[in-house]
From Swiss-Prot:
Cited function: Binds to sigma F and blocks its ability to form an RNA polymerase holoenzyme (E-sigma F). Phosphorylates SpoIIAA on a serine residue. This phosphorylation may enable SpoIIAA to act as an anti-anti-sigma factor that counteracts SpoIIAB and thus releases sigma F from inhibition.
UniProt similarity note: Belongs to the anti-sigma-factor family.
SUPFAM superfamilies reported in the protein's UniProt record: ATPase domain of HSP90 chaperone/DNA topoisomerase II/histidine kinase
GO BP annotation list: asexual sporulation; negative regulation of sporulation resulting in formation of a cellular spore; sporulation resulting in formation of a cellular spore
Domain of life: Bacteria
EC numbers on record: 2.7.11.1
Organism whose genome encodes this protein: Priestia megaterium
SMART domains per record: HATPase_c
Record GO terms (molecular function): ATP binding; protein serine kinase activity; protein serine/threonine kinase activity; sigma factor antagonist activity
Protein name, as recorded: Anti-sigma F factor
This protein's UniProt keywords: ATP-binding, Kinase, Nucleotide-binding, Serine/threonine-protein kinase, Sporulation, Transferase
Catalytic activity: L-seryl-[protein] + ATP = O-phospho-L-seryl-[protein] + ADP + H(+); L-threonyl-[protein] + ATP = O-phospho-L-threonyl-[protein] + ADP + H(+)
Keyword Transferase attached: yes
Length: 147
């Protein structure tokens, strides 16, 4: 059995925390460890922030889309998508410390964090059409300390 949730919201920075908490709440039914939950929340935060800041260039008319699929075997699949400006060179964008917004004091570590916290990450992007992140994490059999 699998369970799925879809979410969409305006590309406003204040909605980043909404996305993070909503995804975390949905995932708790798999009883992840606190570390796993924190890692997934961090990844959602990074991906949504990238969509808002880079994809839509802080244009609040954009929409961020998230799909979460939970599998009975403890696999969590995330899809986070924007219809923004896209990424011209994904390999370059994934390099640690690379940022297109140094004036906004962006660290350029978003993709690095996502790659370290998730088991699989795939990025599809088309210039002027947007970017989609596909992320997968295999949860351990451990139980969370609290739900």
């Amino acid at each position: 059995m699998k369970n799925q949730m879809n979410l969409q919201f305006s590309a406003l920075s204040q909605n980043e925390s909404f996305a993070r908490v909503t995804v975390a709440s949905f995932i708790t039914q798999l009883d992840p460890t606190m570390d796993e939950l924190t890692e997934i929340k961090t990844v959602v935060s990074e991906a949504v922030t990238n969509a808002i800041i880079h994809g839509y260039e802080s244009n609040s008319d954009g929409v961020v889309y998230i799909s979460v699929t939970l599998h009975e075997d403890g696999v969590v699949e995330l899809m986070i998508r924007d219809e923004g400006i896209g990424i011209d060179n994904v390999d370059e964008a994934k390099q640690p410390l690379y940022t297109t917004k140094p004036d906004l004091e962006r660290s350029g570590m978003g993709f690095t964090i996502m790659e370290n916290f998730m088991d699989e990450i795939r990025v599809e992007s088309t210039v002027l059409e947007g970017t989609t992140l596909y992320l997968k994490k295999h949860l351990t059999n451990s139980k969370a300390l609290c739900n």
